[in-house]
C-alpha cells in the first residue's frame, strides 16, 4: 500500500517557497554521491513474493521492490518481515519524516497521529500554512485544503468549504486538489497528482483573455507578479523556452523534484517525476499536437523578412529535392537507399524526412549540435539570399534545446500539413522530383 506521505510530496513541492539567498537550477540537485550508472528501475515482475515492512511504514511485496525504493532513498531500511500494521503506519511515518527533517531539509511534512496510531483528522504543514482533512488511514480528502486556518472536515467530501468574506470563493481556490484514492509508484506521484504549480497555471490561464494566446512567458510574468504579493511565497515560477513554450523539464529547487511537462500547456506528464536528477523528457510533447507550421507563424527570421524569406525557403527545398533525386539515382551513394515513402506524404514532406534521416546519424530522433554542421554547410553553399542563412538554425530550434526535431525542420521549412494538405502555397515546384525514386525521370521546372 502506498504511504500517504508520498501522496503529499508533490503537493508540498509546490507549496514550499524558494530559498531566497541562492539561485538554483535543475542541475543543482543532480545526484553526485552515487554511481551515475546505478539503475533504480529494477524489473521485479518475477521476484518471490515475500512482504517486507520498511522503516517509512510502507509494505513492499518483495525484496526486489524494497531494493528499488532504497536505491532512490538510501535511508530506507527494513523494519521487519511481513506486512506493515496499519495501526502503526502513522507512527512509523512520523518517525521517518522527523529523521528526514533532521538530516535533509526542515520543510518536510511531518504527520500528526492519534493515540491509537491512526492519522489525526486534520493535517497541517506548518512551513507553508496549509491544512487539509484525511481519513483515519491517512488518505487526503479531496477539496479540503485551506491556507492559514483549520479546514472543516466533512462527513461527506461534498460538503462545501467556508468562503472568504466578500469574495464568494472557497478558501481552497488557490490550493491544490487532493485525491482520495492514490495509485501508482513513488516515481509517479509528483506528476500523477495535481501540484500547486499546475493549479496556478490553470488559474492564470483561466484569467487570460479568451482572444489572446496564453504562453509560458505570460504565465512566468504573472507568477512573478503574484510572488510580489503578501503571503504569496509559495508561488512557483515556470521555466520558459523561446516561442512562448514551456521548457520540457520543470523543477522545484527546494525539494529537488523534477518532472516532464507538455511544452504547450505546461501540464505535468504522468510517470516522469524524479528526485535529485533530471528526467528524460520529450522536447516536442504537446497537449494538442499542433501543426508544426503554426509554431513559426509570425516568427521572425533575423535579416530575412517577407519575400526574401519565401525565396530562401524555396531555394532550400529546391536544392534538397534535387539532392534526394540524385542520391536515389546514384547506386554508389550511401544516402541513395531511400525508405519506402509514405503515400500520404507530399513531395516536400518526403524530402524533409529523407534529409532528416541523413543528418540523424545516431537515430536519436533529433539533430544534435554535431549533426547540424552538415546542414549549416548545405545552407551556406546551396541557398539564397545568403543573409537568411546566418540565423536559420536558431530560427528552426523553436524550443531552444540546441537540437532540431523532424517536426521543427518541417515547420521552419514551411511544409507542415494543414488539414491534410501540405503548405505548398506560393511555392515554386522544386527542380527535381522524387518521382525518380519510382524509376521516373525528374520533371524539370518549366
From Swiss-Prot:
Listed Basic and acidic residues bias regions: 161-172, 217-228
Chief location of this protein within or outside the cell: secreted
Keyword Transcription carried by entry: no
Binding site for Ca(2+) 1: 360, 362, 364, 366, 371
Domain EF-hand: residue ranges: 347-382, 384-419
Biased composition, class Polar residues, residue ranges: 206-216
GO-annotated cellular components: basement membrane; cell periphery; extracellular space
Annotated region (Disordered), positions in chain: 147-228, 416-446
Domain Kazal-like: residue ranges: 34-86
Signal sequence segment: 1-21
Lineage: superkingdom: Eukaryota
BP GO terms, sorted: extracellular matrix organization; positive regulation of angiogenesis; positive regulation of DNA biosynthetic process; positive regulation of endothelial cell chemotaxis; positive regulation of endothelial cell migration; positive regulation of fibroblast growth factor receptor signaling pathway; positive regulation of mitotic cell cycle; positive regulation of vascular endothelial growth factor signaling pathway
Keyword Cytoplasm part of the UniProt annotation: no
InterPro entries, A to Z: Dev_reg/Prot_inhib, EF-hand-dom_pair, EF_Hand_1_Ca_BS, EF_hand_dom, Kazal_dom, Kazal_dom_sf, SMOC2_EC, SPARC/Testican_Ca-bd-dom
Residues given in the record as Ca(2+) 2 binding sites: 397, 399, 401, 403, 408
UniProt keyword terms in alphabetical order: Basement membrane, Calcium, Disulfide bond, Extracellular matrix, Glycoprotein, Metal-binding, Repeat, Secreted, Signal
Disease: Dentin dysplasia 1: A dental defect in which both primary and secondary dentitions are affected. The clinical crowns of both permanent and deciduous teeth are of normal shape, form and color in most cases, although they may be slightly opalescent and blue or brown. Teeth may be very mobile and exfoliate spontaneously because of inadequate root formation. On radiographs, the roots are short and may be more pointed than normal. Pulp chambers are usually absent except for a chevron-shaped remnant in the crown. Root canals are usually absent.
Subunit field text: Binds various proteins from the extracellular matrix.
Protein known as: SPARC-related modular calcium-binding protein 2
Classification lineage: Eukaryota, Metazoa, Chordata, Craniata, Vertebrata
Amino acid at each position: 500500500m502506498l504511504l500517504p506521505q508520498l501522496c503529499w510530496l508533490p503537493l508540498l513541492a509546490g507549496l514550499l517557497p524558494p530559498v531566497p539567498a541562492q539561485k538554483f537550477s535543475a542541475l543543482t540537485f543532480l545526484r553526485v554521491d552515487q554511481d551515475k550508472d546505478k539503475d533504480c528501475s529494477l524489473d521485479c515482475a518475477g521476484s518471490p513474493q515475500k512482504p517486507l515492512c520498511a522503516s517509512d511504514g510502507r509494505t513492499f511485496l518483495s525484496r526486489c521492490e524494497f531494493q528499488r525504493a532504497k536505491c532512490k532513498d538510501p535511508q530506507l531500511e527494513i523494519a521487519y518481515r511481513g506486512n506493515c500494521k496499519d495501526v502503526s503506519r502513522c507512527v512509523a511515518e512520523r518517525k521517518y519524516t522527523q529523521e528526514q527533517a533532521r538530516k535533509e531539509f526542515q520543510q518536510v511534512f511531518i504527520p500528526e497521529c492519534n493515540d491509537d496510531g491512526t492519522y489525526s483528522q486534520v493535517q497541517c504543514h506548518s512551513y507553508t500554512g496549509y491544512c487539509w482533512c484525511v481519513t483515519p488511514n491517512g488518505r487526503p480528502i479531496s477539496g479540503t485544503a485551506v491556507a492559514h486556518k483549520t479546514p472543516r472536515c466533512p462527513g461527506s467530501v461534498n460538503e462545501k468549504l467556508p468562503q472568504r468574506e466578500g469574495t464568494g470563493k472557497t478558501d481552497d481556490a488557490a490550493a491544490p486538489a487532493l485525491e482520495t484514492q492514490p495509485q501508482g509508484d513513488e516515481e509517479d506521484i509528483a506528476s500523477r497528482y495535481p501540484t500547486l504549480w499546475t493549479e496556478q497555471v490553470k488559474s492564470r490561464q483561466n484569467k487570460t483573455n479568451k482572444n489572446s494566446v496564453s504562453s509560458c512567458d505570460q504565465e512566468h510574468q504573472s507568477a512573478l507578479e503574484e510572488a510580489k504579493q503578501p503571503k504569496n511565497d509559495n508561488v512557483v515560477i515556470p521555466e520558459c523556452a523561446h516561442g512562448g513554450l514551456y521548457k520540457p523539464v520543470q523543477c522545484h529547487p527546494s525539494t529537488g523534484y523534477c518532472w516532464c511537462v507538455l511544452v504547450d500547456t505546461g501540464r505535468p506528464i504522468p510517470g516522469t517525476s524524479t528526485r535529485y536528477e533530471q528526467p528524460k523528457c520529450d522536447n516536442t510533447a504537446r497537449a494538442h499536437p499542433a501543426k508544426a507550421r503554426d509554431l513559426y507563424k509570425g516568427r521572425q527570421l533575423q535579416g530575412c523578412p517577407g519575400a526574401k524569406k519565401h525565396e530562401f525557403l524555396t531555394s532550400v527545398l529546391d536544392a534538397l529535392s534535387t539532392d534526394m533525386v540524385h542520391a536515389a539515382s546514384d547506386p554508389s551513394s550511401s544516402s541513395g537507399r531511400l525508405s519506402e515513402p509514405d503515400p500520404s506524404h507530399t513531395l516536400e514532406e518526403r524530402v524533409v524526412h529523407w534529409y532528416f534521416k541523413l543528418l540523424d546519424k545516431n537515430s536519436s530522433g533529433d539533430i544534435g549540435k554535431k549533426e547540424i554542421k552538415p546542414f549549416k554547410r548545405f545552407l551556406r553553399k546551396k541557398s539564397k539570399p545568403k543573409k537568411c542563412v546566418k540565423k536559420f538554425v536558431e530560427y528552426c530550434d523553436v524550443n531552444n534545446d540546441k537540437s532540431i526535431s523532424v517536426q521543427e525542420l518541417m515547420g521552419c521549412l514551411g511544409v507542415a500539413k494543414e488539414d491534410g494538405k501540405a503548405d505548398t502555397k506560393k511555392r515554386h515546384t522544386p527542380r527535381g522530383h522524387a518521382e525518380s525514386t519510382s524509376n521516373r525521370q525528374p520533371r524539370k521546372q518549366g
